[in-house]
Amino acid sequence: MNARPARGTLAAVVDARRFGAVVFDMDGVLTDTARVHFAAWKLLFDDELAHRASGVEAEPFELEDYLRFVDGRSRIDGVEAVLDAREVHLATGASSDPPGEATAWGLANRKDELFLQALKRDGVHAFATSVVFVRAVRAAGLATAVVTASSHRSDVLLAAGLDGLFDAHVDGVDAAEFGLAGKPAPDMFLAAAARLGVEPVSTVVVEDAVAGVTAGRRGGFGLVVGVDRTGSASAQAAGGADIVVGDLAELRVVGLRSRGR
């Protein structure tokens, strides 16, 4: 039996004859909203941590913190991970807590408020090369889905002009409704594959967050592709990516598959 190639070393090819579906993360893979999320998180934590620094200059929230503790995770999981890392102790609170309340949920809701303000002010842009790749996947006969921890999936896809390119969606609203654990647990990806009617082993996962790459590997998906826009290729490969590319322009679709629809 041949050994599986080292993570991150497979040819940058999706063979439509091997797979039935491709599941995409949204922020950072399809849309240039990861930078908006980071900016909102930075505003939140730079203010919050400075407020709690007790006369000592607080260490700012940096991109490395975003990638390590927040990227790909739900808002509440991200807040709690950062607070734990900074040894800040707040009650969890409830999802109904108003933005800015001195609870983890209050901070999570404040982050959501900041993100929506930036989204309204700056708009949403899709990565053109990602749109080309999604269209190539569909032209090859593969089903497509979006998986995101965001509760604003429909608004973002609509604003980016991507709402008609996917057969299924699993987002933060679904996660709350159905009790799906966030990444790095594979629950949301597994739910997307189930909605498409395709087994995980016959499904490709495309992710930019290490937590999402790990979720794809833990879920037993047939191919896990990491998209490295932030210098995290090594971490993605270590997390389980079979292929790591800097942009989806580097990933080719070969072969054809009848979708049977």
What are these regions (language model features)?
Residues 29, 33, 148, 212:
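Ser/Thr-glycine-rich phosphate-binding loops at phosphate-binding pockets of nucleotides
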Residues 6-10, 15-26, 30-128:
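N-terminal helical cap/lid subdomain that shapes the substrate entry/recognition surface
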Residues 71, 125, 145, 180-184, ...:
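Residues that cap or flank secondary-structure elements
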Residues 119-124, 147, 222-224:
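Short, flexible loop segments at the rims of nucleotide/cofactor-binding pockets, characterized by
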